[in-house]
Amino acid sequence: MELYDLTNPQKSIWLTEQFYRGTSINVICGTVLIDDIVNFDVLSKAINIFLKDNDSFRIKLCLDENGEVKQFFQDFCEKHFDVLNVSNNIELKNLEKEIATSPFNILGDALFSITPFQILTGKGGFIVKAHHIIADACTASLVASKIMTTYSSILNEDEEIKSIPTSYINYINSENEYLNSPKFEKDKEYWEEQFQTVPEFGVIPSLIESSAESS
């Protein structure tokens, strides 16, 4: 199993996670509603195709022998998704809230979940939940779009399912190349020169202070 360092954006999120440990501050969550009778077998296939083609959703975190946080990519293994039944919008909102406010066990466990649900009418959808260390709000939107595109392709029996594999390892490698390049040294020199004198911090007056000054 190959271990990789966190990228610089991930390190920032990891520090936030440590400060707000045990909370859902880094949980990104969204719901996809399908305005039609849902074929959940096909939806499961579409989700598994997405997971196979996007290794960032197979990232797991661990601590190495020195206690440093590392990441690794779990091999793809087809997943089974249980479908939850909801009676109405209130139950759906409660389910969304429960999922969105539940923190991840960030070391060792999967950093995402996808929860299909069915409404009494036969319509339904799925709730996507991911840790910010592997995704952002834009990613969540792309996840929904890719899964639904694949879902429609399978339903329509398209001969070719347009699914383009992407790898976070490419980004890790590109960041490492930059950090070991002359360009990085040049950029570092520039910014160190810019901040030889640390600028004063800007302060936003509180509402209480503003009210006191105006009275």
Positions of the model-derived regions?
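Short amphipathic alpha-helical segments
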Residues: 26-32, 79-82, 131
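Acyl activation and transfer enzymes in specialized metabolism, enriched
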Residues: 35-58, 128-145
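A general secondary-structure signal for short beta-strands and their flanking turns/coil
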Residues: 25-27, 109, 123
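Active-site-proximal acidic secondary-structure segment that organizes catalysis
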Residues: 3-5, 9, 117-169
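Short amphipathic alpha-helices and their capping loops
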Residues: 1-21, 44-90, 95, 110, ...
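Short catalytic/binding micro-motifs of nucleotide second-messenger systems
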Residues: 58, 99-106
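Conserved hydrophobic/aromatic beta-strand scaffold that supports enzyme active sites
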Residues: 29-33, 142, 190
